[in-house]
A protein has these predicted regions:
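Conserved positional slot within leucine-rich repeat
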Residues: 56-58, 89, 117, 148, ...
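Leucine-rich repeat
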Residues: 2-210, ...
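CRL adaptor-proximal regions
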Residues: 1-18, 454-471
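Hydrophobic, well-ordered secondary-structure elements that form the walls
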Residues: 317, 363, 382
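C-terminal interaction modules of eukaryotic adaptor/scaffold proteins
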Residues: 386-427, 433
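Conserved hydrophobic position(s) of the canonical leucine-rich repeat
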Residues: 85, 113-116, 144-147, 168-173, ...
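C-terminal per-repeat helix/turn "cap" of leucine-rich repeat
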Residues: 45, 137, 161-164, 183-186, ...
Length: 471
């Protein structure tokens, strides 16, 4: 048996060795740094490929924490590698090596760099302590396809240089300081940009998006430390925009205006922290509809984060999206004394909600309080009226005993459902606000909010696994 396995491995090695060097080099370049280096042990022919294949140089916290001497290896790798460098990811303690970064970025080995990520290990609440982005980072503008900058001050020089990024497809700016003019200039120089993520940046009060290629935009605001932060986001002209992702329900901005986004399919998380939301000519103020005149037929996924089970607010949004397929409701914590107890909304068949007739197939309720009648009525409303509903997933924010779910089952089981095929799944878990969503750039995901449950830590501790209950 052992001899057969050894022969099989040898045959596989022979087959791979028949491939042209260019193909083998491409294979090596797709591997992580450690795995790529290990290919030298496969055969003699593979050994020179590692030094000539496109390099993915990833220096992360794990490596730096083991020994500071690894930092000294970076210039050695860059000087000795004979091939181009495709990716340079540096996650570092900025105080230890900031003065060296400029030299690394000036290396000829990085001349055709496609992906650059600079992420300081530490980020200070005081934005005055942020280091300026190394000027050498700007020299890659002609070739970069992916750029991620975290915890830097981006000087106005970026705007004055009118840099062009003809190949840039993904851009992430997180906890950076940058002026409005510099950011607008940077974005106007990205004719191929498909995804943009802006997280907790300072210096931008108003951002106007006008892009013919942008498909996904993720954003959130952090106002805890003062300064100028994003207060108004305007989608002026984005014909290809499919996703508008507010990554934190409490992370603003105060005003969002969607003027032209004819392909918008995924929107969320919406919350009352957004003081004013314009969807064409439809206006919401703190989740309350002021006017309902525009309908968006392209919208298929909506994520809403209300304070308590406010059916009126949710229904007003549903009226805007007649073809909605999936609804996620992430309840925010609220004192039980002011829950919407009288929230048993009556459905008027003469004025039906369009998405209830043919399209709404999935409803997910997170942080659900099954002991409160307002939450029970909230779930009942969809069971009684959504004719196309296939599944409803309900997650409690805490560990619950069997009796808790048995009580909910008894209240929901006997309902006369509009859709006889609707399945209800109950589980306990951890309070979840979906702030873990990190899929702004993953355009392959059909629904970036369709993620596995975190699970209940107490159930795992008791050896119960991820227990679910069906209704």
């Amino acid at each position: 048996m052992r001899t057969w396995r050894m022969r099989s491995r040898k045959r596989k090695r022979k087959k791979s060795s028949r491939l042209p060097d260019a193909v083998l080099g491409s294979i090596v370049s797709l591997l992580a740094t450690k795995e790529g280096a290990r290919t030298q042990a496969i055969s003699r022919r593979w050994r020179p490929l590692w030094r000539s294949a496109p390099l993915n140089l990833v220096v992360n916290r794990e490596l730096i924490n083991k020994t500071h001497k690894l930092i000294d290896l970076i210039p050695k790798v860059l000087s000795e590698h004979r091939g181009p460098t495709r990716r340079f990811l540096l996650c570092f303690c900025i105080d230890d090596c900031y003065d060296k970064i400029e030299g690394w970025l000036s290396s000829q080995a990085l001349d055709s760099l496609q992906e650059l990520q600079l992420n300081p290990k530490l980020w200070f609440a005081d934005r005055k302590k942020l280091y300026p982005l190394p000027p050498a980072a700007c020299r890659f503008s002609p070739t970069l396809r992916v750029a991620k900058f975290h915890g830097f001050h981006l000087p106005d020089l970026i705007g004055h240089l009118s840099l062009k990024f003809p190949c840039l497809e993904q851009l992430t700016l997180e906890r950076v300081t940058i002026s409005e003019d510099a950011l607008q200039s940077m974005l106007s120089g990205c004719p191929a940009l498909e995804s943009l993520e802006l997280k907790e940046n300072l210096g931008i009060a108003r951002l106007c998006i006008s892009s013919q290629t942008l498909k996904s935009l993720g954003f959130c605001v952090d106002s805890r430390y003062g300064g100028v932060f994003l207060q108004e986001l305007v989608i002026e002209d984005a014909p290809c925009l499919e996703r508008l992702l507010a990554l934190d329900p409490k992370g603003g901005p105060a005003t969002i205006r969607i003027i032209c986004a004819p392909k918008l399919e995924i929107l969320g998380m919406l919350s009352e922290d957004i003081s004013e939301l314009h969807l064409g000519r439809t206006i919401f103020q703190k989740g309350v509809a002021v006017s309902l005149t525009t309908k968006m037929h392209t919208m298929r996924v909506l994520v809403f984060s209300p304070v308590g089970p406010d059916l009126d607010a949710v229904v007003n949004f549903l009226k805007c999206f007649p073809c909605l397929e999936r609804l996620y409701v992430i309840f925010q914590p609220l004192s039980r004394a002011i829950y919407y107890i009288g929230n048993a909304r009556k459905y008027d068949p003469l004025h039906p909600i369009e998405c209830f007739q043919l399209h709404l197939k999935k409803v997910v309720l997170k942080n659900y309080d099954g002991e409160n009648s307002a939450f029970i009525n909230f779930a009942k409303f969809f069971l009684l009226n959504a004719k196309a509903l296939k599944e409803m997933k309900i997650t409690s924010p805490y560990h619950r005993q069997h009796n808790f779910f048995a009580n909910i089952q008894s209240k929901l089981r006997d309902q006369l459902r509009a859709s006889p095929d609707a399945q209800i799944e109950l589980r306990c878990g951890t309070r979840d606000y979906f702030t873990r969503n990190k899929h702004t750039h993953d355009l392959s995901m059909n629904d970036p909010f369709d993620m596995p449950s975190i699970g209940c830590w107490r159930c795992k501790e008791l050896g119960l696994g991820d227990t679910t209950y069906q209704v």
